[in-house]
Amino acid sequence: MKRFSAQYIFTNTGAPLKRGIVAADDDGTITGVEDTGGVLSEKESLEFHNGIIIPGFVNCHCHLELAHMGHMIPPKIGLAEFLRLFRAGRIAGQEKIISSAASADSEMYRDGTVLCADICNTTDTFSVKTNSKIKYINLLEVFGIDPEKANRRLNEIKMVSDIAESLGLSWSLVPHSAYSISLKLFSLLLAETGSNKITSMHFMETRAERSLLENQSGPLMDSYIESELIDGRPETVRDHVAAVLEAVTRSGNLILVHNTYADRDTIRKVNKRGNLFWCLCPNANLYIEDHLPPVDLLIGENCRIVIGTDSLASNNRLSILEELKTIHSFYPSVSLSDLIKWATLNGAIALGGEDKFGTIEPGKKPGLLLLKDIDLDKMQLLPESHITRLI
């Protein structure tokens, strides 16, 4: 058994414990948590660290199969142009895709991730996940704006789900976004997802989504025409609210990803769904659109916030801590305890893993991370703040 202490322990079950003690078995299961009142009376067989002990991170939005695309697409070009270059650059050899994914998986684990919702369009990362130390929830993503190809698109992703099932991997079928799926494909997908426990969807990532849905115009529409993805006017949901409340399954939790241009009216309307989580991937938002989601608005509307990294096509690292640093630098009023809760407990709840992850309490196996080089007086992250895995 191992026993750890630090300046503070954020258990997510109550107030931070000053110089508390957490004990764990060799397999990482928490066996005890002690509130010392800030006074350590014994130091024998105890590892004391200068920093904050927190549960392992939960990444609620990742694209591991795009790990080979690091530095291929220039930053700050907008989503429409990003997608155009993405379609051209995604193709790569199987060996490169798998080796890049394996490297990214190892780095993500070192950076503290214990549970991850990963978007899959193919089976490319399945071999990596069967040997990973990270628990993955595979969100098998379907997209297709051409209604004539709707049945084919659904059948393709169902073939991916068959392989995931045969390997014993956790999976759900999910839509890509409101703007990339025809009404017909939404309808077909809805019939297949009535028992989903977890669904996710890219949401309000760019202003161009609204112009496409409402007027069939703008940069995304131009991109579809240029890429010959559709012939004529697309048949889409009328707006983002209709996508959430009418087109997407009401079953289980729904994670809305990015929310870069979310507005108060839309937030209030879609929050009526219930079981809704708002995933922030700020570094990807800055990389693609050079714009951040309205974090203060989401907080003010009592949205349950979770954290994701997106992909190495739109980010330099798959590090949850780096995402938290970015949020803290632009929104310094957000408390460190809230940031940690978003990146741990909220994510665990969103992914249905709160029985094991997200809190430091007996019987759970959340992983233990040491958050170092922070401003302990102000409880703020610094550019040099970093994570060390204890378990």
Can you say where each PLM-predicted feature lies in the sequence?
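Histidine-rich, glycine-flanked metal-binding segment
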Residues: K2-R3, I9-I54
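Alpha-helical scaffold segments that flank or form the walls of functional sites
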Residues: A23, I52-I53, H68-K133, N155-S166
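Histidine-centered catalytic micro-motifs
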Residues: P55-A67, I198-R207
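Active-site beta-loop-alpha junctions enriched in small/polar residues
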Residues: H63, N121-T122, E141-I145, H176-A178, ...
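Active-site gating loops and adjacent loop-to-helix segments of metal-dependent hydrolytic enzymes
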Residues: H68-S99, I137-F143, R207-S251, G274
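Glycine-enriched alpha-helix->loop->beta-strand junction motifs that scaffold or abut catalytic
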Residues: S132-Y136, E192-I198, T249-L254, K269-C279, ...
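Active-site glycine- and acidic-residue-rich loops that bind
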Residues: V174-L190, H258-T260, L286-E289
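His/Asp/Glu-enriched, well-ordered alpha-helical/loop segment
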Residues: M221, S227, A247-R250, C281-A284, ...
